[in-house]
From Swiss-Prot:
Glycosylation sites: N4, N19
Residue ranges that the UniProt entry lists as topological domain Cytoplasmic: 54-68, 129-147, 224-259, 303-345
Extracellular side: 1-32, 90-107, 169-202, 277-282
Protein name: Trace amine-associated receptor 6
Keyword entries, A-Z: Cell membrane, Disulfide bond, G-protein coupled receptor, Glycoprotein, Membrane, Receptor, Transducer, Transmembrane, Transmembrane helix
């Protein structure tokens, strides 16, 4: 009898004095501090890192190109993940409770899905852009213009927002799972149970663009390899100014494709565990332990913080732009026309 009483006392609730409250599964104080530091660092990096990317591309006129506008829009999606998703998911993960209300739970879930797909669509369009740039660099400026980039950006935002809003604000995502959804619907929880049809739709929506990107980047690197061999074979010969220009353009586009290819690979690695886990869960009766699910979620969230690090590692112009912004030189009238590129490509 005494052991049962102590067990009841040990149970903690998200809202101690509210009927129907979710059970709270607390971490130790030390673990909570570590988790808040790890997750908080990711959120801060996602917000300020992507903010630097957006400011750099929008402020410096030298960076105003169709590709970079897509990159800035991608950074905006990752920035919004850092603002609207990661801080609240951090509290939910560490405290094992949702303290922000049911309405905001729906909004949070909607943002989570919408910005994920927005990132995926942006990366898919960037892959197409890079494919054209590398395979036909001299014709590329006439094919992928600023207006085409604007259309791609619009599609990358409108479709995910419409899809996410339609699925989560109409409640169709849990059709056929009403009993399970009601059982999990306690006060202080924000668990979204998605049925097999929508999980399969989500998985295909992730897999098909990912497959397209793999094909495109595979072709990009095959073409880049052929171009590099061609340049190497003709390197000892005297080049005309026209051939020299073609070589410089091709080299620049290959370098950009390589960097953005790393971004695509990082996205795939980050989101693949979550996508596979969601698919398995829906068809195997939601068997994934909570800790595994949270790890998959945070691997995906951390992708929003990775892109600025990739740009800083591979793009000298981004490092220079950061220095100009952080030191306050960006406030000078002449900063917008500053040269961020080295003379040699």
């Amino acid at each position: 009898m005494s052991s049962n009483s102590s067990l009841l006392v040990a149970v903690q609730l998200c809202y101690a004095n509210v009927n129907g409250s979710c059970v709270k599964i607390p971490f130790s104080p030390g673990s909570r501090v570590i988790l808040y530091i790890v997750f908080g660092f990711g959120a801060v990096l996602a917000v300020f890192g992507n903010l630097l990317v957006m400011i750099s591309i929008l402020h410096f006129k030298q960076l105003h190109s169709p590709t970079n506008f897509l990159v800035a829009s991608l950074a905006c999606a990752d920035f919004l993940v850092g603002v609207t998703v990661m801080p609240f998911s951090m509290v939910r993960t560490v405290e094992s409770c949702w303290y922000f209300g049911r309405s905001f739970c729906t909004f949070h879930t909607c943002c989570d899905v919408a910005f994920c797909y927005s990132s995926l669509f942006h990366l898919c369009f960037i892959s197409i852009d890079r494919y054209i740039a590398v395979t036909d660099p001299l014709v590329y400026p006439t094919k992928f213009t600023v207006s085409v980039s604007g259309i791609c950006i619009s599609v990358s935002w409108i479709l995910p927002l419409m899809y996410s809003g339609a699925v989560f604000y109409t409640g169709v995502y849990d059709d056929g799972l009403e009993e399970l959804s009601d059982a999990l619907n306690c006060i202080g929880g924000c668990q979204t149970v998605v049925n097999q049809n929508w999980v399969l739709t989500d998985f295909l929506s992730f897999f098909i663009p990912t497959f397209i990107m793999i094909i495109l980047y595979g072709n990009i690197f095959l073409v880049a390899r052929r171009q590099a061999k061609k340049i190497e074979n003709t390197g000892s010969k005297t080049e005309s100014s026209s051939e020299s220009y073609k070589a410089r353009v091709a080299r620049r586009e290959r370098k950009a494709a390589k960097t953005l290819g790393v971004t695509v690979v990082a996205f795939m690695i980050s989101w693949l565990p979550y996508s596979i886990d969601s698919l398995i869960d829906a068809f195997m009766g939601f068997i994934t332990p909570a800790c595994i699910y949270e790890i998959c979620c945070w691997c995906a969230y951390y992708n929003s913080a990775m892109n600025p690090l990739i740009y800083a590692l591979f793009y000298p112009w981004f490092r220079k732009a950061i220095k100009v912004i952080v030191t306050g030189q960006v406030l000078k009238n002449s900063s917008a026309t500053m040269n961020l590129f080295s003379e040699h490509i």
